[in-house]
Amino acid sequence: MKISVSSYSFYQYVRAGKLTLVELPKLAHDIGFDAIEFIDIPGETQEEKLALAAQIKAEADALGMEINAYTIGACLYQETDEASDKEVARLVQQLDVAVALGAKVMRHDVVYALGKTGAARSFDGMLPTIAKNAQRVADEAAKRGITTCTENHGYISQDSDRVERLFNAVNRDNFGILVDIGNFVCVDEDNVTAVSRLAPYAVHVHAKDFIFKSGKEVKPCGLSMQMIPFTRS
């Protein structure tokens, strides 16, 4: 097992111009991490993304730092075959970015939100399309020696029951689960039970915690908004 850090942890510094993505492997190395994970390499074109990924990999290689995962956004539920083809093609390009980084794992989302009509109204309605498109991405990933995965993330596919059903529906040897230890509490699920359920399918792990509150804490608010009845006289 290797302990890594995500580039997302330094997002505010990168956004403020205090760090560049190319500098992150050294920072992670100096802090003491074994590896680093990158999120959505930016670029106006695929060529720019590949060039930046190659720069990052060269810096990591010089330090003996592994880039152990590449994490991207995606929506694998689409209303039409044409839209599905377009999104799958975009993810295949992202697989090439993962190759340029030297990452052996690529995590992608599966859906962002429920819709108001048709199959998009429920997770089960969307699942066949999501699974089919995830299979297509996984099959392309296999040609590149990459394992794809999805995360318990984004509310729609976050509880362990849905994530396990998605895993079974995709049914590819190089498709697994990125288990985020903390995210289950966001859908009112016991973390220990959920992690135990998905552990056999895990190919990558995010260690996260939350401060869980009862909802009964006293918090300041505007006058007359809560407990104290203010009236004009």
Model-derived segments and their meaning:
Residues 58-66, 77-177, 186-188, 197:
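Active-site acidic/histidine proton-transfer and metal-coordination neighborhood
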Residues 35-60, 110-122, 215:
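Glycine-rich, proline-tolerant flexible connector loops at the mouths of alpha/beta enzymes
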Residues 42, 74-84, 223-224:
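The substrate-binding groove and active-site-proximal loops of carbohydrate-active enzymes
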Residues 9-11, 40-42, 73-76, 110-114, ...:
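Active-site-proximal loop/turn and secondary-structure-junction residues that shape catalytic pockets
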Residues 12-16, 45-47, 79:
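A generic structural signal for short coil/turn motifs at secondary-structure boundaries
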Residues 7, 31-40, 69-74:
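Short, conserved active-site loops that position catalytic residues or coordinate cofactors/metal ions
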Residues 1-34, 51, 57, 61, ...:
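Histidine-acidic metal/acid-base catalytic patches
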Residues 37, 69-71, 107, 149, ...:
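Conserved beta-strand positions in the central sheet of alpha/beta enzyme cores
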